[in-house]
A protein has these predicted regions:
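PEST-like, low-complexity acidic/proline-rich intrinsically disordered segments
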Residues: 1-26, 33
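Hydrophobic transmembrane alpha-helices of multi-pass solute transporters/permeases
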Residues: 2-5, 30-33, 38-124, 130-236, ...
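Flexible coil/linker segments and helix-coil junctions enriched in charged and small residues
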Residues: 242-243
Length: 622
């Protein structure tokens, strides 16, 4: 041993504390993979140099709760590390750039160029900015494609992060791709290009694809990175100054981290959308694409200067291959072409027979992990099953990104841009998130009600359905009160006439939509992080995000309803599907709801990436 090497010294010190054996594999200083380093500034940092990596006996002094204490003591949040706030700021800048850009997509694609304008801008408060004049179906189709593409690419970003580059470096590469996409969007909107609609839409589409690659790689990795900065993994007892004994619960801390992470997302969203909508109206679309690009440059800047302070989990090679092999082994002898027989065979304890302890010395060479990692994989797959209902939730949410913006244009605007009204959604979130975190959730815990993630998500589906009821009713009265009946968009484009109903009537839709996101969307981030294996967090997060992409694909089937006079039926169908999702989600997951504490407190797992090396041999070397 080299006594001058601090990482080796820490490892020896840790090895003398038997009670820390469960933490050794995770907290061991990783060696830097020279082949993967893109620059010395963003290499993987040894865990012993990272803020939050414990190297003393603090854990030995903690008192862990008994089953009785888990049931009876009040649960509180732990302290959030400052590094999490820097990651949240990076997300704020990224969301400003993304939503500031996408906020003007509908008008850019759908509406015609105002008379006398070369940039799409208009000073006439009764007119709507526009550029390419491709209609509502085209704008709905392209915005749905953008949503689909941006949420399918996280799977690729997760694969690269978990197996090869790690989360930090994958984020940096993704930022570079997104910046390139933003620049191409700026080019598509400059006057010399926008005057040729076919060339502009081609340029716009290329920028959309490249930006989606960057957005996807960023999204699947930034949310696990922010929660990983909090290092506590198990609940422990703390005595407050008042003498009250409480449980510091990591699950509640992660819940708070994601609540305020989502708060910063929406601060970035609302500032980006509001400012860029006015830039679109008074200057032109090119400025609405250029300013978000400038702010996006803060993302790599902050990450670069904080790079040595972040806790980073080292990628562990072919972890996906290991998980697939494990599942394939568990399925051995269970396959059947008869669906009923297949279901019955898989109703038995699925994972117990393929645990290393059950296989004994005959276990395969590739099985370089312990029983606890098998439990983590099983838990992660259960989380993915939970997310399967989410497309029906996102189908309702996605109405705010396209059809409801078009609906606003056909209402009495009173000088307000039609694509600024949907900012009531992030505004509602900014107001409601602190209320839920400081009042509603603690109040429910104080009353003894365990508002688990499964219960919260179910409520999210119900509230989303209620928001779509409001959208259906409003669209019905637009047709009833409008000067052209059920041809509201034709009436607006040809005659500049609109329904006398105030656009602020839409507020109820966006407020209910925001509350539904607190219950369902934020909880999905929390659930993906807490239920995934530690070396597969990006991919489980990507599965949660992929449900949005799948929802966008389903939404393409409803594009035919995204036009007059069928819009009432469009919102009605989405309403029904949201309530069906709520019922189906609860019926398929209520048993999982009862195991929440058990799943959150699985024993620490051990995993080695070295193929052909048994776990026993790996432990002996330590």
């Amino acid at each position: 041993m080299n006594p001058s090497d601090p990482s080796e010294t820490v490892e020896v010190a840790k090895a003398t504390a038997n009670l820390h054996d469960a933490h050794l594999n995770e907290k061991k200083a990783p060696s830097i993979d020279k082949d993967l380093a893109i620059t010395p500034s963003i290499e993987e940092v040894p865990a012993t140099t990272v803020i939050g990596a414990t190297t003393d006996d603090t854990d030995l002094q903690k008192t862990y709760p008994t089953d009785e204490e888990l049931r009876t003591l009040r649960r509180v949040c732990g302290q959030i590390p400052w590094t999490s706030y820097t990651v949240a700021f990076v997300e704020l800048c990224e969301r400003f750039s993304y939503y500031g850009t996408t906020a003007v997509f509908v008008n850019f694609i759908q509406r015609p160029m105002p008379a006398g304008s070369s940039t799409g801008a208009t000073y006439d408060s009764s007119r709507v900015p526009g550029a390419l004049d491709m209609g509502q179906q085209a704008s709905t189709g392209l915005t749905l494609f953008n949503s689909f593409w941006s949420y399918i690419m996280p799977t690729a970003g997760a694969f690269v992060a978990d197996q090869y580059l790690g989360r930090f470096r994958t984020i940096m590469y993704s930022i570079a791709a997104a910046l390139l996409g933003h620049l191409i969007l700026v080019i598509s909107a400059i006057p010399s290009v926008i005057s040729h609609p076919q060339g502009a839409i081609a340029c716009f589409s290329i920028g959309l694809i490249i930006m989606g690659v960057g957005t996807g790689g960023f999204k699947s990795n930034i949310s696990p990175l922010i929660a990983e900065q909090y290092r506590e993994e198990y609940p422990y007892i703390k005595t407050l100054a008042s003498g009250e004994r409480v449980i510091v619960d990591p699950a509640i801390t992660i819940q708070r981290i994601y609540l305020y992470y989502y708060l910063t997302v929406n601060i970035g969203s609302i500032t980006g959308q509001v400012s860029m909508v006015y830039a679109e109206r008074y200057v032109g679309f090119w400025l609405s694409y250029f300013l978000p690009t400038c702010l996006f440059l803060w993302c790599p800047t902050v990450l670069f200067f904080c790079r040595n302070k972040y806790y980073r989990v080292k990628p562990q090679g072919s972890v996906y291959g290991q998980a697939f092999r494990l599942w394939k082994l568990a399925m051995k002898g269970r396959w059947s072409l008869n669906p009923v027989r297949l279901f019955k065979r898989n109703d038995k304890p699925f994972w117990e027979s393929v645990k290393p302890s059950a296989l004994g010395p005959n276990r395969p060479q590739w099985m370089t992990f312990d029983d606890e990692w098998v439990d983590e994989v099983a838990r992660g797959l259960k989380a993915c099953k939970v997310f399967l209902w989410y497309p029906l939730f996102w189908l309702a949410y996605n109405q705010m990104l396209n059809n409801l913006t078009s609906q606003a244009a056909t209402m009495h605007l009173g000088g307000v841009p039609n694509d600024i009204i949907n900012n009531l959604n992030p505004l509602a979130l900014i107001i409601c998130i602190p209320i839920f975190d400081r009042v509603i959730y603690p109040g429910l815990r104080h009353l003894g009600f365990n508002f688990t993630p499964i219960k919260r998500i179910t409520c999210g589906f119900v509230v989303a359905g209620c928001s779509m009821i409001a959208a259906t009713v409003i669209q019905h009265y637009i047709y009833v009160k409008g000067p052209c009946g059920k041809e509201a968009n034709y009436c607006l484009d040809e005659y500049g006439k609109y329904s006398p109903i105030s656009v602020w009537t839409q507020a109820i839709i966006y407020i209910l939509g925001g509350i539904s996101e607190i219950f369902a969307s934020i909880t999905s981030l929390e659930y993906a992080f807490t239920k995934a294996p530690k070396n597969m967090r990006s991919i489980v997060q990507a599965v949660a995000l992929f449900m949005n992409a799948f929802s966008s694909a389903i939404g393409q089937a409803f594009v035919g309803l995204s036009k007059d006079p069928l819009l009432v039926y469009n919102y009605m169908v989405v309403t029904i599907l949201a309530f069906v999702g709520a019922i189906g989600f609860w019926l398929s997951n209520y048993k999982l709801d009862r195991r929440e504490d058990e799943l959150n407190n699985l024993p620490q797992s051990k995993y080695t990436e070295k193929s052909g090396v048994s776990l026993d041999e790996e432990n002996a070397r330590k």
